Amino acid sequence: MASSSSSASRTWRYRVFTSFHGSDVRTSFLSHFRKQFNNNGITMFDDQRILRGETISPALTQAIRESRISIVLLSKNYASSGWCLDELLEILKCKDDMGQIVMTVFYGVDPSDVRKQTGEFGIAFNETCACRTEEERQKWSQALNYVGNIAGEHLLNWDNEAKMIEKIARDVSEKLNVTPCRDFDGMVGIEAHLRKIQSLLDLDNDEVKMVAISGPAGIGKSTIGRALHSLLSNRFHHTCFVDNLRGSHPIGLDEYGLKLRLQEQLLSKILNQDGSRICHLGAIKERLCDMKVFIILDDVNDVKQLEALANESNWFGPGSRIIVTTENKELLKQHGINNTYYVGFPSDEEAIKILCRYAFRQSSSRHGFKKLTRSVTELCGKLPLGLRVVGSSLHGKNEEEWEYVIRRLETIIDRDIEQVLRVGYESLHENEQSLFLHIAIFFNYEDGDLVKAMLAENDLDIEHELNILVNKSLIYISTDGRIRMHKLLQLVGRQANQREEPWKRRILIDAQEICHVLENDIGTGAVSGILFDTSGINEVSISNKALRRMCNLRFLSVYKTKHDGYNRMDIPEDMEFPPRLRLLHWDAYPSKCLPLKFRAENLVELDMKDSRLEYLWPGTQLLTKLKKLNLEGSYNLKELPDLSNATNLEMLDLSVCLALAELPSSIKNLHKLDVIYMDLCESLHMIPTNINLASLETMYMTGCPQLKTFPAFSTKIKRLYLVRTGVEEVPASITHCSRLLKIDLSGSRNLKSITHLPSSLQTLDLSSTDIEMIADSCIKDLQRLDHLRLCRCRKLKSLPELPASLRLLTAEDCESLERVTYPLNTPTGQLNFTNCLKLGEEAQRVIIQQSLVKHACFPGSVMPSEFNHRARGNSLKILVKSSASFAFKACVLISPRQLQCERNQRRVKIRCRVTDGRGRFVGSKVVSLEHPNHSTGIRTKHLCFFNGVLTEVSCDALCFVFKISAYNPLDNYEISECAVQILTNEPERRSCDGGSE
């Protein structure tokens, strides 16, 4: 049986094809039939239009295939024509292959005679079959039996032939009206959505099923619902699409009256009876319980709507399907709808296609608009509604006009988009709206626990309110626990905030308005937040009492989107901050310390990035609510305050605090500290010892050259970055760090040896150190070690025995490396010994003997003897026996021809393509030699080895072609020699030829 989607995607030349016996109906019934269809605007194929001289049978066959509906007029002489019977076979074939609709009319003949080929109809059939084969007879007989079972109009059941023709024409019109249309052809991603929803619908199951389509506003739920209605309607007795349910709340109706009105609307639509009136709520069940119906309830926003229209499955006949589209997932739980298709955002590629369809009327951007297209797609957040509306507005616009729209989109949402998205916001209660606004303005992409701490109030169940926003698809919680709101919804929130009356406005975000409020001390208790971008303002002087009247101010964020180096805010040293502050974010804070009267007991986050602070405050503050402390870039900061009470602090950022020399001993109390950033603390030399922070997992201390002692803050630590420090040794106590996964000591030149490592370690980076020795015992037992990086360890002479778990060994530019311990236990690893020019022959043999290694590279110019199939140049042909598969090992000699760039050679790719003797593709392999930062790349001749497998080899010759390309297009390498070793099913004959392409 053809799928409905196949018929939906076809172009039909004719609405109707009629199969008939001419002498029975052409000048009587058929002529009236044609006239009625013409009056109804239904195009029929007319066999009288066939040009003379054209073979009639192929022309009719083509006409059948190009018709949406075929009507078979079965008269007493229909079976006397082999031509008619062949038409019937073609019609039924089109029904199966293309989803063509078949209707029947029994004109002066009994359906039973058609099915059984009896009576006068049977006599005519037997006469036709007399000169035909038994196979033809069987095919015709089966076709007549099938078509005789199709319920159709029977002339004997009608007193008036004209009325019967009107009824047939009306039925055809209805079928054409529900015929899958072309409205959704070419809609990006629609086919994938329809395919997935159809699997949920399980259309072959006779149970009644309710399925939901859920997702945020503007994602395309209604569009998908309409496409489904178009696609599947012809599979049901009655169908209807009930739209605008969100607005179905007539004034003056109680709940019972509302439900009656909704049921009347549904029955009027599905039964095609305008003005249906009912007097009780059992009407839908009474009228539809034995009908197979397909109903789509669009934009449902109240469970009462579902109770009125689809309260129970037994309201509908077997095989019925009810689809509900909604943004509210909680509503679906309340009604017990468990089968839900959640409409996700399109991929980057699909989003660009959607935009281009409307902006350029094609699926890709025009020349010169690629970057602009990506910018618009990003600003629309890949929301289909936004892409459609903005794309349509950009149609025919030049690049300058596109750039104007992009600048506008950063702060203002299109009215048509806002009209749709604002509905969700307006459906919220006051507390929920307040939460929505605060997330939109302050806390999008923030950690959920942090947001709860920021917004928690005694009278507000923040967890419950967040769940409401999630269930209404206004936010979602990412897998890492962050609260995320769509960019366009953020703009909806900002504009909703700005529409409030100034004296009622809860959050101030307009820079000029904020300046006016602060300069004139006219803030009010209604203000809970200030988001102040100082980039575009003139100089503003703030009095010490500017914030005092804002007694409920909890969130203060002062920042610059454009950093020009100028401080435009003049603030007094004794400025009063409201005591209820939970968020204080002030980029480039201009004073040496916070005011003496500053109270921090309610602070959840203190962010003073790039400040001029030398210290925060004297003495000890109550900091039990503080979770984040960010002082990054505070060059002048000399000391931290007493943090004894900051027992809930989770993140501490001291990066680029150039003057900070030591950490306070009170840091030992930070038992919830998860991550600490101290990169580029160039003066830091003293850290507390003998402390064990229970929660610390990650420590960043890159670029702390004065730090000589290995920090031992926590035995629970997972990641430790000590890049370019003055650390001289790794202490034995590190073996107690049983959760440590990664240590990066690269660039720590004082490190000479390493003797102790924890067994949990997965990644170790000792690159650019002066390490001379790695103890055998500390590496070989690391059964989880995955990556070992030793680049530019210029004093390292030998490698210890390595664990079998190792997948990547990078020892590039180890100029003194001579020995590699045998066996090299890396059966499936990648071994990079680029520019290890002193690597001995014995070490090279150890590397070569790793037969299953993913790939390996080291300096050399002589092909190993075990590669018995070899050739000069980059191609090689081998004669083989046919086999199910071949495993092979390849070796290529890489010669640098031209190196323009001495540093940052990040990648060299080697491609191997295998064809048979006739040039047909057999298999391929791509090897990428990743070089670390600041690598000089391959400077001399190198041998590169890699493995491959060829499956289903059914030829007697294989041709290997190798190509090499560099990340930097200015560099030029060549493959001067290549070789292959067959590891299984060794061919009897040697290679025949080779050469360069």
UniProtKB/Swiss-Prot annotation:
It comes from the Eukaryota. Gene3D superfamilies: Helical domain of apoptotic protease-activating factors (1.10.8.430), P-loop containing nucleotide triphosphate hydrolases (3.40.50.300), Ribonuclease Inhibitor (3.80.10.10), Toll/interleukin-1 receptor homology (TIR) domain (3.40.50.10140). It catalyses: NAD(+) + H2O = ADP-D-ribose + nicotinamide + H(+). LRR repeats lie at residues 194-218, 534-557, 600-623, 624-647, 649-670, 671-693, 694-714, 715-737, 758-781, 783-808. Residues 12-176 form the TIR domain. Residues 191-447 form the NB-ARC domain. The active site is at residue 87. SMART domains: TIR. Transmembrane segments: none annotated. One of its GO terms (biological process) is defense response to fungus. Keywords: ATP-binding, Hydrolase, Leucine-rich repeat, NAD, Nucleotide-binding, Plant defense, Repeat. Disruption phenotype: No visible phenotype under normal growth conditions, but mutant plants are susceptible to the pathogen Leptosphaeria maculans. InterPro entries: Apaf_helical, Disease_R_plants, LRR_dom_sf, NB-ARC, P-loop_NTPase, TIR_dom, Toll_tir_struct_dom_sf, WH_DNA-bd_sf. GO terms for molecular function: ADP binding; ATP binding; NAD+ nucleosidase activity, cyclic ADP-ribose generating. It is an enzyme of class 3 (hydrolase). Its EC number is 3.2.2.6. The TIR domain mediates NAD(+) hydrolase (NADase) activity. Self-association of TIR domains is required for NADase activity. TIR-NB-LRR receptor-like protein that confers resistance to the pathogen Leptosphaeria maculans (blackleg disease). This is Disease resistance protein RML1A. It comes from Arabidopsis thaliana (Mouse-ear cress). The gene is RLM1A.
